[in-house]
Amino acid sequence: MYPLAFAKEGEEVIVKKIDAGCGAMQRLVSMGINIGSKLKVIRNQNGPVIISTKGSNIAIGRGLAMKIMVEDAEYGGENEKL
C-alpha cells in the first residue's frame, strides 16, 4: 500500500484505507471515493491529484491524497468499472 499522492499518471489503483477525519471522509464518499473504489490517476504533478472514477474526473488536494492508501489494481483489486 502507498498514498494516492505517490501513484503515477495512467496508473489504476484500488482504495484500501483512508486515514482522514469524519468531514474529509464524508466529502470523499460524496465524490464516490470509498474503500474498494477503483481510481485512475489522470494527472499527478504539482498541485492536486486528478483522478477518474465512475466516469467523473475529480481533483484531490495533495494533503488528502497522502491519506488515501491505495494498491495497484492489477494486483489487488476488484473488477469495478471506472
Swiss-Prot record:
SUPFAM superfamilies: C-terminal domain of transcriptional repressors. GO terms for molecular function: transition metal ion binding. Keywords: Ion transport, Iron, Iron transport, Transport. The keyword Cytoplasm does not apply. It comes from the Archaea. The keyword GTP-binding does not apply. GO terms for biological process: iron ion transport. InterPro entries: Fe-transptr_FeoA-like (IPR007167), FeoA-like (IPR053184), FeoA_core_dom (IPR038157), Transcriptional_repressor_C (IPR008988). SMART domains: FeoA (SM00899). Belongs to the FeoA family. Might be involved in Fe(2+) ion uptake. This is Putative Fe(2+) transport protein A.
